Curated annotation (Swiss-Prot):
Enzyme class: hydrolase
Organism per entry: Rickettsia canadensis (strain McKiel)
Binding positions (Na(+)): A166, C169, S172
Quaternary context: A double ring-shaped homohexamer of HslV is capped on each side by a ring-shaped HslU homohexamer. The assembly of the HslU/HslV complex is dependent on binding of ATP.
Entry protein name: ATP-dependent protease subunit HslV
NCBIfam families (alphabetical): ATP_dep_HslV, PRK05456.1
Gene Ontology molecular-function annotations: metal ion binding; threonine-type endopeptidase activity
A family per Pfam: Proteasome
Gene: hslV
GO cellular component: HslUV protease complex; proteasome core complex
Length: 182
C-alpha cells in the first residue's frame, strides 16, 4: 500500500456562505484498496461547536492532533489562530509529532484554517477549504456552486459538493456528516 493513499484517503470540506460555516466529512475508512468502515466520524467539536475540526490521514494520528489542538485552544483562551500556529510549530519541531501523518481543517466564526505536518497554517481564499483524496473534487464543486447565483444554503452546497467528490474519489463515500459552527 502506498503511504500517499494511506494519508489522503478521505474528503473533508469546509465552507462559509453568508454567516453559516459548515464542515463536512465522508465516513469511509480505507486500508489500501479495502474499505474497513463506511460510517467513521472524522469531525470533532470543541467548545460547544464554537470550533470544529476535521482530519484526513491516519486515524490515530488525527485523534492525537485533535487532543493537542484542544489543549492549545484551552491554553490560549479559545484563540483559534494562535492555537493553530502554536500546534503547527510543535508539529513541525517535535520529534514525535513530526511523524504524524494527517492534515486538519479547523474553523470558528472568524477563521477557516488548513494545518499540515509541514508547519503550514493556511487560511484559504474564497471561504472554502478541502483536504484528502477527494478534496480537490469537493473544493471545485463548492467553489462553482458558490459562484453561481442560487438560493442554496451552506449545508446544501456542502452536501452536493461532497456527493460529487464521493462519485469521483474511490476513497470517499456518500455517508456525509456535517457540523455547523455556532
Amino acid at each position: 500500500m502506498s503511504d500517499n493513499l494511506a494519508l489522503h484517503g478521505t474528503t473533508i470540506l469546509c465552507l462559509k456562505k453568508n454567516e453559516d460555516i459548515i464542515i463536512a466529512a465522508d465516513g469511509q475508512v480505507s486500508h489500501g484498496n479495502t474499505i474497513l468502515k463506511s460510517s467513521a466520524r472524522k469531525l470533532r467539536t470543541i467548545a460547544n461547536n464554537k470550533i470544529i475540526a476535521g482530519f484526513a490521514g491516519s486515524t490515530a494520528d488525527g485523534l492525537a492532533l485533535f487532543e493537542k489542538l484542544e489543549a492549545k485552544i484551552e491554553k490560549y483562551s479559545y484563540n483559534l489562530l494562535r492555537s493553530a500556529v502554536e500546534l503547527a510549530k510543535d508539529w513541525r519541531s517535535d520529534k514525535y509529532l513530526r511523524r504524524l501523518e494527517a492534515m486538519m481543517i479547523v474553523a470558528d466564526r472568524s477563521h477557516i484554517l488548513i494545518l499540515t505536518g509541514n508547519g503550514d497554517v493556511v487560511e484559504p481564499e474564497n471561504n472554502v477549504a478541502a483536504i484528502g483524496s477527494g478534496g480537490l473534487f469537493a473544493l471545485s464543486a463548492a467553489r462553482a456552486l458558490m459562484s453561481c447565483e442560487n438560493n442554496l444554503t451552506a449545508e446544501e452546497i456542502a452536501l452536493k459538493s461532497m456527493n460529487i467528490a464521493a462519485d469521483l474519489c474511490v476513497f470517499s463515500n456518500r455517508n456525509i456528516i456535517m457540523e455547523k459552527v455556532v
